[in-house]
């Protein structure tokens, strides 16, 4: 509200979580632009994010800071904890706007994303466009009845359900693969990450088969792309890596659900191959599950939970195989799916851990 100096800090040293900064750089690439990259490791390793930030007018004074110390006579900083302070002389009521493009591939792609999405628009125009898109998405389901509070709860939950997964391909289709190479999507297709599969395979993914079949096909293709690189379907992928979080191999249920509901746009035979190979991986007690039909509770924590989710996923594989006419695979996984009976205790009508235990 008054004439004076206004500054914007681009702070690559700051993090909301306990991430390790592996590498970073900041560079002035135009009188009104700062670009750079930060590569971090935390839940997964190697999460490079490139950016290109353009101000609404040329920068008047640019101060570089590395490891807390001011650096002079440079247009680029390389290191880990980096900051840039862009300063402007402003009149009372004047606003400095900053348009930022991001990419997991390159600064060039970040700049292209920014120009594609934001060129010719100010903050208010972008805000109105975002509001319109959210209104369109939330209008995809219309409900009747219930109290005002219940309807607010419903649409709030629908909003939350649309925050992730994240589309990670750029406007030109390029994206960072799990081997850190660069892939490219086909025209009209998208590549997604942040697939919290253990949390979402039961309800969210089935809901999406009703709301957006093209999106579901993109999710399946994303999972198969990860399989092509790693030899295994994703469990809980983030950015360009795998967290390995939670139990089961629930990509198979997402793929089977899509196929059984008539959603195509991916190779069913390749999908079945990926499902079978992922189910044969020796992770989280799967070796006992495959060999013995149960997971000893004294050898593996979460043994019952792991078994039940393996069994459900195996049932999904059997259904997919049957739909594709692969009867041998269907029979094998249908038998594996019955492993749940090995931990069902009829005396209490509940599932219980099984193993060799010493009496106290």
Question: Where do the model's predicted regions map?
Answer:
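Beta-sandwich/jelly-roll carbohydrate-recognition scaffolds of carbohydrate-active enzymes
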Residues: 1-192
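A generic secondary-structure signal for well-formed alpha-helical elements
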Residues: 2-6, 16, 20, 59, ...
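Short, solvent-exposed loop/turn and secondary-structure capping segments
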Residues: 109-111, 167-174, 206-209, 217-220, ...
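Short alpha-helical scaffolding segments that buttress acidic/His motifs in well-ordered protein cores
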Residues: 154-161, 223, 275, 337
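Glycine- and aromatic-rich loop/turn segments at beta-sheet edges
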Residues: 170-188, 228-239, 283-301, 345-359
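Aromatic-rich carbohydrate-recognition surfaces in CAZymes
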Residues: 193-321, 334
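Catalytic cores of carbohydrate-active enzymes
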Residues: 234, 318, 322-360
């Amino acid at each position: 509200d008054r004439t004076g100096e206004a500054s914007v800090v681009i702070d690559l040293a700051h993090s909301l979580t306990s991430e390790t900064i592996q590498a970073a750089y900041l560079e002035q690439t135009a009188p009104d632009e700062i670009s750079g990259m930060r590569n971090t490791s935390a839940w997964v390793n190697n999460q490079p994010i490139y950016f290109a930030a353009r101000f609404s007018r040329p920068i008047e004074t640019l101060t570089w800071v590395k490891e807390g110390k001011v650096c002079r006579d440079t247009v680029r900083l390389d290191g880990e904890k980096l900051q840039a302070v862009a300063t402007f002389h402003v009149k009372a009521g004047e606003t400095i706007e900053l348009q930022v493009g991001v990419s997991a591939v390159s600064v060039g792609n970040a700049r292209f994303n920014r120009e594609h999405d934001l060129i010719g628009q100010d903050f208010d125009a972008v805000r109105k466009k975002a509001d319109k898109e959210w209104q369109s998405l939330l209008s995809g389901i219309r409900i009747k009845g219930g109290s005002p509070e219940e309807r607010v709860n419903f649409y709030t939950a629908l909003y939350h359900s649309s925050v992730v997964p994240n589309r990670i391909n750029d406007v030109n289709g390029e994206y960072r693969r799990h081997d850190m190479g660069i892939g490219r999507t086909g025209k009209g297709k998208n590549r997604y990450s942040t697939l919290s599969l253990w949390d979402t395979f039961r309800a969210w993914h089935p809901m999406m088969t009703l709301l957006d079949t093209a999106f579901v096909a993109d999710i399946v293709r994303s999972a198969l792309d990860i399989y092509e690189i790693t030899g295994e379907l994703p469990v809980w992928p983030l950015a360009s890596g795998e967290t390995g979080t939670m139990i089961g191999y629930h990509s198979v249920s997402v793929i089977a659900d899509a196929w059984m509901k008539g959603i195509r746009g991916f190779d069913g035979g390749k999908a079945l191959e990926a499902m079978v190979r992922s189910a044969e991986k020796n992770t989280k007690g799967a070796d006992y599950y495959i060999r013995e039909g149960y997971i000893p509770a004294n050898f593996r924590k979460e043994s019952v939970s792991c078994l039940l989710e393996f069994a459900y996923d195996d049932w999904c594989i059997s259904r997919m195989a049957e739909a594709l006419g692969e009867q041998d695979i269907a029979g094998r996984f249908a038998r594996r799916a019955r492993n749940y009976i090995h931990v069902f205790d009829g005396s209490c009508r509940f599932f219980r851990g099984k193993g060799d235990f010493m009496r106290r």
